Amino acid sequence: MAKKVLKVVKIQLPAGKANPAPPVGTVLGPTGVNIMMVCKEYNALTQGQAGMIIPAEITIYEDRSFSMKIKTAPVAELLKREAGISKGSGEPNKSKIGSITEEKLREIAEYKFPDMNAASVEAAMRTIEGTARSMGITVQK
């Protein structure tokens, strides 16, 4: 018989830097799961991606055990890294703050494709291009 799910928690933390302090402790504390074990597993799974914000989905079961699924980095983080900027434009329609090439856009789409709801890499590229546009990043064709 399968374990009964108590709660599913989604978190986004810097890779390899999870600790029991807030926000992790605040979210996981009421569930009764061993927070330090969750932090150790997250850090072990994300240690090769230092400097990125990595989302994770933690499924907590009634017996206080858990399973963790690591996702790919958010598109906005990938775009900021490729464009060499620290944050998106406050006025994306008026001021453009960076640019990326179409090849870089394809690389991001291929990396992100397993986590996206897109039928093809080209469809994923269009979605990511829209995100770039809303951040004030231009795509050079």
Curated annotation (Swiss-Prot):
Post-translational modification: One or more lysine residues are methylated.
A single GO molecular function term of this UniProt record: large ribosomal subunit rRNA binding
Matches recorded under InterPro entries: Ribosomal_uL11, Ribosomal_uL11_bac-typ, Ribosomal_uL11_C, Ribosomal_uL11_C_sf, Ribosomal_uL11_N, Ribosomal_uL11_N_sf
UniProt-listed Pfam families: Ribosomal_L11 (PF00298), Ribosomal_L11_N (PF03946)
Keyword set includes Ribosomal protein: yes
Subunit (UniProt): Part of the ribosomal stalk of the 50S ribosomal subunit. Interacts with L10 and the large rRNA to form the base of the stalk. L10 forms an elongated spine to which L12 dimers bind in a sequential fashion forming a multimeric L10(L12)X complex.
Listed name of the protein: Large ribosomal subunit protein uL11B/uL11C
Gene behind this protein: rplK2
